[in-house]
A protein has these predicted regions:
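Ribonuclease/tRNase effector modules and their secretory precursors
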Residues: 1-83
Length: 83
């Protein structure tokens, strides 16, 4: 799936050593897709990452952009054991 990274997302991915394959998996086939609570243009794609202790990767992206613009990405501790 094609997407664009914001400058913030690029920085976070490098700092936290988030593998591109994990990001691709979350965007291509999320385990859970949620709307943003206050911004209808944003979606949250959540993906359990077995290669990283089954932690849940949360990718927040602007779905109105073509290709989608990834705003931020992080491992969501609040989702541990929920997916």
């Amino acid at each position: 799936m094609a997407y664009v990274l914001s400058a913030h997302a690029e920085t976070i991915i490098q700092e936290r050593e988030i593998a591109p394959a994990w990001l691709d998996a979350a965007m291509r086939a999320p385990d859970l897709l949620l709307p943003h609570e206050s911004d209808p243009t944003l979606h949250h794609a959540l993906k359990r990452i077995p290669d990283f202790g089954n932690r849940v990767l949360r990718v927040i992206y602007n779905a109105t952009k073509e290709p989608p613009l990834i705003v931020t990405v992080y491992f969501d501790r609040t989702m541990k054991g929920k997916l």
